[in-house]
């Protein structure tokens, strides 16, 4: 079985007494499966995890955010088995706040905010 490593980053976005979560599409085209979670996504080549977290929150929610701390507040590590491949994934989450109102429509993968 082949093995690879994957890295992602996301945001735990606080606004007043609320925490921002998104409902993601899951599965094949036309599937009605979904799940709620923090906005997150893959790091692009040469991108720092903190930069990826800010970018992903914006892409998935349309909100401009800033970090409350340069260090992640949580790290998640897990293994995904997909066909004949094992993916060892690490995700860093950063605490953030909204700095400007809704700027754009969320990505197509997002069903609800």
Predicted features, each with a name:
Residues 1-38:
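N-terminal strand-loop-strand
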Residues 11, 40, 53, 57, ...:
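Residue-level detection of beta-strand scaffold positions
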Residues 13, 86-88, 106:
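Extracellular/periplasmic catalytic domains that process cell-envelope and extracellular macromolecules
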Residues 14-19, 27, 44-45, 73-78, ...:
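Short, charged/polar surface micro-motifs in flexible loops or helix N-caps
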Residues 28-35, 91, 95-113:
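Nudix hydrolase/Nudix homology domain
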Residues 38-73:
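The catalytic Nudix box helix
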Residues 62-101:
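Active-site segment of metal-dependent pyrophosphate-handling enzymes
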